[in-house]
Swiss-Prot record:
GO terms for cellular component: helical viral capsid; host cell cytoplasm; host cell nucleus; ribonucleoprotein complex; viral nucleocapsid. It holds the Pfam family Paramyxo_ncap. Signal peptide: none annotated. Phosphorylation at Thr-279 is required for the formation of the nucleocapsid. Ncore is globular and carries regions required for N self-assembly and RNA-binding. Ntail is an intrinsically disordered monomeric domain in the C-terminus. A motif (Nuclear localization signal) lies at residues 70-77. Keywords: Capsid protein, Helical capsid protein, Host cytoplasm, Host nucleus, Host-virus interaction, Phosphoprotein, Ribonucleoprotein, RNA-binding, Viral nucleoprotein, Virion. Residues 433-452 have a biased composition (Basic and acidic residues). Residues 1-36, 373-391 are annotated as: Homomultimerization. Residues 418-525 are annotated as: Disordered. Belongs to the paramyxoviruses nucleocapsid family. This is Nucleoprotein. InterPro entries: Paramyx_ncap (IPR002021).
Length: 525
């Protein structure tokens, strides 16, 4: 048996080990396409600001091709360094693209005010064609839809401080898009707006240079569909992190935004470690968790072997990311989610609608937190020198502070209330009759009358007065209402009616085991 266990441990380690590179053959290269990246050909701030202005307009042009859009974005991303060309050549190692650098200088003979640096060759026409200034119609179209403040006609400046503020504002909006461009592009707008408000309050960006939503959507879509662009951005982040000493302000801002980018798409793996293992509850000793604990141990070793690119494996489309999916350890993940929703309110809004989600182990995690509330770890107490009297005091305080948290209903609640189909009577309330039915109708009537007399906000207070005092608020519903102001009143009304019904059902007692089925179509609107 000992030999079998050793073989099993060795098998688990080798199973999740990444392939070993060998020198039997050369690197596999794909069919490359050329990306032209314009960079400043001199150290003039006017040249850089004019190039930034033309590239922002170019990205806002809907007729721009994908490779040209990628080149324009790489040019903007590298404008904050002293030598953009050296930076691009140093960090670029992409098997799918071949980058060509074009130095840009000022010109009074071109419509764009820029030309490509060359030895004795007139390149004004080519520069105008690249920056879409050869067609007056496209030139006029490119002036709209890039800044929300339509009074800004251009962003050409002469002083370095003003240029850095404008460039930092534009770069912040581009880098924020990376966090959810791959994992959750449909829900990215809210988080991006929160980041923008944060950096505006910190004076890291200038609010007047907020870019149009259409422009940001174009950039987000390009980041999502172009792996080469994401490879460049990740390589730039890693290069900034390796830089010793003080970094430029824009570089520090990029590192700050990286905290939202790092480990994107790895929430299941990270949260399972945080709530399932680091909490060290006794439930980890269950036999059901033995296999998944060894799997998670192998994945943690694999994560470390991948090096500095491991947190970006989803953004870089690394095929090994599938091993870190929660489907590889479903029981431990379900247990960790139960622990998480009890310990942190922010976990209540997570989506648990997975095919491998196990409600039994989810409830196990919840019960472990509830029954372990106020207990002090003897091992940690001995290491910290905590006496038995101090441990009892801590337990007593913790029990009082967690009573309110334990009494709240947190987590998925899909099975608590069942709604009838449309072919059933709207006013029918099964297992409610006589006195209870009249009380429901009375509470609804008083709520509607209060709404007519006092308005939406005061009517909500009036309805709240008829609720049982012991009925807790739905945290998940409240958070969703705060995120959608247009539906907040309707959601609050539905929540109050639902709580009124729940309060009535609690007064019935425990005579029946069949759950009550309510029918209120207003709750489904």
């Amino acid at each position: 048996m000992a030999t079998l266990l050793r073989s099993l441990a060795l098998f688990k380690r080798n199973k999740d080990k990444p392939p070993i590179t060998s020198g039997s053959g050369g690197a596999i290269r794909g069919i490359k396409h050329i990306i032209i990246v314009p960079i400043p050909g001199d150290s003039s701030i006017t040249t850089r600001s004019r190039l930034l202005d033309r590239l922002v307009r170019l990205i806002g042009n809907p007729d721009v091709s994908g490779p040209k859009l990628t080149g324009a974005l790489i040019g903007i991303l590298s404008l904050f360094v002293e030598s953009p060309g050296q930076l691009i050549q140093r960090i670029t190692d992409d098997p799918d693209v071949s980058i060509r650098l074009l130095e840009v200088v000022q010109s009074d003979q071109s419509q764009s005010g820029l030309t490509f640096a060359s030895r004795g060759t007139n390149m004004e026409d080519e520069a105008d064609q690249y920056f879409s200034h050869d067609d007056p119609i496209s030139s006029d179209q490119s002036r709209f839809g890039w800044f929300e403040n339509k009074e800004i006609s251009d962003i050409e400046v002469q002083d370095p401080e003003g240029f850095n503020m404008i460039l930092g504002t534009i770069l912040a909006q581009i880098w924020v898009l990376v966090a959810k461009a791959v994992t959750a592009p449909d829900t990215a707008a809210d988080s991006e707006l929160r980041r923008w408000i944060k950096y505006t309050q910190q004076r890291r960006v200038v609010g007047e240079f907020r870019l149009e939503r259409k422009w940001l959507d174009v950039v987000r879509n390009r980041i999502a569909e172009d792996l080469s662009l994401r490879r460049f951005m990740v390589a730039l982040i890693l290069d900034i992190k390796r830089t010793p000493g003080n970094k430029p302000r824009i570089a520090e801002m990029i590192c700050n935004i990286d905290t939202y980018i790092v480990e994107a798409g790895l929430a299941s793996f990270i949260l399972t470690i945080k709530f399932g293992i680091e909490t060290m509850y006794p439930a980890l000793g269950l036999h059901e968790f033995d296999g998944e604990l060894s799997t998670l141990e192998s994945l943690m070793n694999l994560y470390q072997q991948m090096g500095e690119t491991a947190p970006y494996m989803v953004i870089l489309e690394n095929s090994i990311q599938n091993k870190f999916s929660a489907g590889s350890y479903p029981l431990l993940w379900s247990y960790a989610m139960g622990v998480g929703v009890e310990l942190e309110n922010s976990m209540g809004g997570l989506n648990f609608g997975r095919s491998y989600f196990d409600p039994a182990y989810f409830r196990l995690g919840q019960e472990m937190v509830r029954r372990s509330a106020g207990k002090v770890s003897s091992t940690l107490a001995s290491e910290l020198g905590i006496t038995a009297e101090d441990a009892r005091l801590v337990s007593e305080i913790a029990m009082h502070t967690t009573e309110d948290k334990i009494s709240r209903a947190v987590g998925p609640r899909q099975a608590q209330v069942s709604f009838l189909h449309g072919d059933q009577s709207e006013n029918e309330l099964p297992r409610l009759g006589g006195k209870e039915d009249r009380r429901v109708k009375q509470s609804r009537g008083e709520a509607r009358e209060s709404y007519r007399e006092t308005g939406p906000s005061r009517a909500s207070d009036a309805r709240a007065a008829h609720l049982p005092t012991g009925t807790p608020l739905d945290i998940d519903t409240a958070s969703e209402s705060s995120q959608d102001p247009q539906d907040s009143r309707r959601s609050a009304d539905a929540l109050l009616r639902l709580q009124a019904m729940a309060g009535i059902s609690e007064e019935q007692g425990s005579d029946t085991d069949t759950p009550i089925v309510y029918n209120d179509r207003n709750l489904l609107d």
